[in-house]
Amino acid sequence: MSKVILLCLIFALFACSISALSKNKNCLKLGQKCNFEKKRCCTGLNCYISQNKCLPVKL
């Protein structure tokens, strides 16, 4: 029974990692123009309208 649960957990983690990678696949990379684009900037980046670029998030 514990092997089945362990296999289910491994499968769930694998599925989550695949979905996370596919979300970031169709996004704008660092330095790409982002104004009036249908795509969004990748995770960790924001579109700065004044510079029209995807740049790292400033905290």
From Swiss-Prot:
The keyword Signal applies. It comes from the Eukaryota. One of its GO terms (cellular component) is extracellular region. Belongs to the limacoditoxin-3 family. Its main location: secreted. It is found in: Secreted. Keywords: Secreted, Signal, Toxin. This is U-limacoditoxin(3)-Dv33. Probable toxin. Shows a relatively potent antiparasitic activity against the major pathogenic nematode of ruminants (H.contortus, EC(50)=2.6 uM). Does not show insecticidal and antimicrobial activities. Does not induce increase in intracellular calcium in mouse DRG neurons, suggesting that it does not induce pain. The natural peptide is not amidated. The recombinant peptide is amidated. GO terms for molecular function: toxin activity. Residues 1-19 form the signal peptide. Expressed by the venom secretory cell of the spine. The spine is a cuticular structure containing a single large nucleated venom-secreting cell at its base. It is an independent unit capable of producing, storing and injecting venom. On the back of D.vulnerans caterpillars, spines are grouped together by 50 to 100 to form scoli, of which there are eight in D.vulnerans.
